[in-house]
């Protein structure tokens, strides 16, 4: 039988992960932009093509791209006192002459409807999640070793 005793001081562990959370927000945002440029959903699948009438109206054939707001996500940064980074297309900004926000429109596209195919464009891809978890795990391991 092997036994081991380890002492460490919990007060030495820095639980401020705001830097890592902000980096995670940037990883998600960059991954999101890259996927939409390729026309891929959050699972890496090709999204449903646009209808001919939509292409004619927009003047181009890029899914979920009009103003750029849906692909250029906003990252509300984490701080030492607020350990949360929020990533969204826009929760406050409304479309001109409307009460509808970018998040509202994003939800509509995410769910789809009878005349709009479901396009699961928003979320965290497996690749981004893996990279984020690895980064945060390494940081926590470093803090525990230093304690």
Enumerate the predicted regions with their spans.
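Short, Lys/Arg-rich flexible segments
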Residues: 1-147
């Amino acid at each position: 039988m092997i036994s081991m005793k380890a002492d460490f001081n919990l007060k030495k562990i820095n639980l401020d992960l705001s830097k890592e959370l902000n980096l995670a927000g940037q990883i998600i945002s960059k991954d999101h932009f890259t996927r939409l440029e390729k026309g891929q959903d959050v699972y890496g699948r090709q999204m449903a093509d646009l209808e001919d009438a939509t292409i004619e109206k927009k003047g181009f054939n890029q899914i979920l791209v009009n103003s750029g707001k849906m692909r250029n996500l906003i990252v509300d940064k984490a701080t030492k006192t607020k350990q949360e980074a929020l990533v969204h297309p826009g929760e406050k900004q409304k479309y001109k002459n409307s009460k509808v926000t970018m998040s509202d429109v994003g939800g509509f596209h995410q769910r789809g409807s009878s005349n709009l195919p479901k396009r699961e464009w928003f979320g965290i891809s497996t690749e981004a999640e893996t990279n984020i978890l690895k980064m945060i795990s390494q940081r926590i391991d470093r803090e525990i070793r230093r304690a």
